[in-house]
Design a protein with these regions (language model features):
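Cytoplasmic helix-loop-helix junction between adjacent transmembrane helices
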Residues: 147-184, 372
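Symmetry-related core transmembrane helices of the 12-TM Major Facilitator Superfamily/SLC fold
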Residues: 206-223, 418-433
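Interfacial helix-cap and linker-helix signal at transmembrane-aqueous boundaries
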Residues: 77-78, 108-109, 197-202, 285-286, ...
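Helix-loop boundary and gating motifs at the non-cytosolic
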Residues: 45-95, 261-262, 266, 271-285
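A late C-terminal transmembrane helix in Major Facilitator Superfamily
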Residues: 382-411
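Structural signature of the two symmetry-related core transmembrane helices
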Residues: 117-131, 212, 326-341
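Helix-to-loop junctions at the C-terminal end of transmembrane segments
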Residues: 101-114, 199, 311-323, 409
Length: 447
């Protein structure tokens, strides 16, 4: 009897220590493994601490380069005496590839048997792209480098989500995605600061050397993730191995997935309203106070990153308790409020404070988008293709946003533009409220 009590006390103490030493509760994963009967017949996940830490640092180091070098490309090519037309062509080509490559990139990850290998190839491709910019800044090579970078980014995002799902499984994927978002936000901010300082103190060319240096530890972190701990079926949202291969959905079947298409439409409207909002604020601030415009816009970018880093793990945990729908409604509701506040507020300090709302939506989306896709594609084997569909909707909305905002501003003024963008955001909120169902499986509700 005494031995029994000692074993119980040791078990409870061990679990408590593990929970207190990690923000992503590994006890959840271990409990799922011990239970042996997870919802949906999924193989229990029991990733090692080394693999989880490796994923943390991989996300940290690739965060800033995953979506592009941003304004650094324009600055660098301008110093190389490129015309604005040529710079625009390069950026437009990259944007076009990024838009059309979302679904093929997701489908490629679904076909892969090693998500870690795919992620490594994507990182190596971005390294080559950065070296191309630095070594040979002529139009053909820079164009090829920008296309390679855009294509690699289309694969890298789904690959990170697939590795995460393959490691921890559906039961605690919300916690894992929250942790990913935190490390990505911190990595994004620090890498941008490092690149900016490098460009200022050294040269614009040196920014791309820094990019390569950041990607070397990213590859080392990726290597720390144990390949045998990433379940390929789980990473694709596939049916359990004991079921027939026919249970895997055809790629076209996702186009009949009504909740997924509703969510894609809502995301398109959200980004149609959101993407041009901060640049429009920048234009308004510059006209009113050109001296402080750069500092104000920098603060408007940093504040949401801080909010994302602080809130993302909490959102991942709340998603398991509240469900997905309440958090999505909060995120969609924040955007029209933000747009209307920009109409009536001119004080720079308050403008920066309003960006807290942007941080809330960014934190929710960083967790909820892949999480909802994981819910809706579970058992289909098309998790990453589902991410690609939503990525295409997001990119379409974002690409149209600047044109819409620019037209409205030129014709009717900035107040009308902000009001119109807020109205578009409200339509997206209405669709989420009326049409978007709760996607959290009932068996995964927190107890």
């Amino acid at each position: 009897m005494d031995d029994c009590w000692r074993r119980i006390l040791r078990t409870n103490l061990s679990r408590r220590i593990i929970q207190e030493c990690s923000e992503l509760p590994p006890a959840n994963v271990e409990t799922a493994a011990a239970a042996g009967t997870p919802a949906g017949g999924e193989t229990p996940a029991a990733p090692s601490r080394r693999s989880l830490r490796g994923l943390d640092w991989f996300v940290f180091f690739v965060a800033d380069v995953q979506t592009g070098f941003g304004p650094f490309v324009s600055v660098y090519l301008t110093t190389q005496r490129w015309t604005q037309v040529d710079i625009g062509l390069v950026l437009s080509a990259a944007g076009f590839v990024s838009l059309i490559g979302q679904m093929p990139g997701g489908a490629l990850v679904d076909k892969a048997r090693s998500e870690r290998f795919v992620a490594g190839i994507a990182v190596a491709t971005i390294c080559i792209s950065a070296l191309t910019y630095a070594a040979l800044p002529i139009f053909p090579t820079v164009l090829a480098g920008s296309i390679l970078h855009a294509a690699a980014s289309c694969v890298l995002g789904p690959a990170i989500a697939a590795i995460s799902l393959g490691l921890v499984g559906h039961a605690v994927i919300g916690d894992r995605l929250g942790r990913n978002a935190r490390f990505a936000s911190i990595g994004n901010g620090l890498a941008a600061a490092a690149m900016g300082a490098t460009g200022y103190f050294l040269s614009a060319r040196a920014v791309f050397i820094v990019t390569v240096l950041l990607l070397i530890p990213a590859l080392l972190a990726l290597r720390a993730i144990a390949e045998n701990e990433i379940d390929p079926e789980r990473a694709h949202g596939a049916p359990p191995r004991h079921l027939s291969a026919k249970a895997r959905a055809r790629p076209g079947a996702l186009m009949n997935n009504r909740p997924l298409l509703i969510f894609a439409g809502c995301l398109l409207l959200f980004h149609l309203a959101n993407s041009a909002m901060l640049p429009l604020v920048g234009s308004v601030v510059t006209m009113k106070s050109a001296r402080w415009a750069t500092l104000i816009i920098a603060a408007c970018i940093v504040v949401p990153q801080i909010v994302v880093a602080a809130m993302s793990p909490w959102i991942g945990a709340r998603a398991q308790i509240w469900g997905r729908r309440p958090l999505l409604i909060i995120a969609f509701a924040a955007l029209p409020i933000r747009g209307l506040l920009f109409v009536v507020i001119s004080d720079p300090t308050i403008l920066v404070a309003v960006q807290i709302l942007d941080g809330i939506t960014a934190a929710v989306f960083a967790v909820m988008v892949p999480l909802v896709v994981a819910d809706l594609t579970r058992g289909t084997g098309r998790f990453n293709l589902g991410q690609g569909i939503l990525g295409t909707a997001t990119g379409t909305g974002a690409s149209l946003s600047a044109t819409l905002a620019g037209y409205l501003t030129d014709r009717f003024g900035s107040a009308a533009a902000f009001s119109s963008l807020a109205a578009v955001a409200f339509v997206g909120l209405t669709l989420v409220w009326l049409l978007m169902p709760e996607t959290r499986p009932a068996k995964e509700a927190a107890t």
